[in-house]
Amino acid sequence: MSTLHVLSHSPFGDDRLNSCLRLIGTNDALLLCGDAAYALQPGTAPFTALNTRGLTLYVLAEDAQARAIDVPGWATAVDYPAFVELSIHHDKVNSWT
């Protein structure tokens, strides 16, 4: 069973990203959207935490672009139709609100 974890809040405002990383399974994936895209800023603790985990990571392309975030090679930028496909592909979707 796999879960798509969706984060939309800045990793610098609360501990949701760290909580998610503690619970995420090997078959799960993480999608960053909205201000959660700031987790991909190089040189930050969230960037390092995501990079070292080796997890399946997606970011909404338009949210990364709107925040001038370059998507690293270990993450995949997706559009909204791909977000829907990811939601269908996984058994569950967990939105960290």
Regions found by a protein language model. Give the residues of each.
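Short internal beta-strands
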Residues: 29-34, 56-62
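N-terminal beta-loop-helix "entrance" segment that forms/cooperates
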Residues: 37-53
